[in-house]
């Protein structure tokens, strides 16, 4: 009797459909924030093997084919591009991946922001203004290099990026040199280097004019 019961239980277990693992999506390599307009490889698992799946995000979509194990490769063949977003204040982007054989859905929410700075250098040099920065992830330091004739004249440390998108808002003077000896066109370069490196890429940069003060 016990043997018959055990065999019956085994038969029922074999007859039940297996429960598929929940589908998931993630960026490969992992990121904490998307830069507007930049492409990122999307990986995933738990989808119908070799069956078309669709990924949608803020008015855009793309179709991919998972491999024989139901996984997305997370390389150039499964990239998605962040939408244009002209703001230094992050917003949340929702990404949804679905297939219909059987219906499978995975979602991912991630902040998106414009990397850079508002660069408020136009106006009275001595005025204290609001500086905004974004894209300095992992608490990266934020430096502003003031250049004249392509030579570094002053470097200011504004602080460090905060949160998943490496943002910072700080009140600081427009132009940190009280009595400049050079007038005309200056440049400012924003990056994470304590000293300006000519070959380094800036996260934000612009030129501005420092006028010679009038006498009398």
Features from the language model and the residues they span:
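Bacterial N-terminal signal peptides that target proteins for export
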Residues: 1-8
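Extracytoplasmic/secretory-pathway segments with low complexity and glycosylation-like composition
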Residues: 14, 21-216
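Bacterial N-terminal signal peptides
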Residues: 8-17
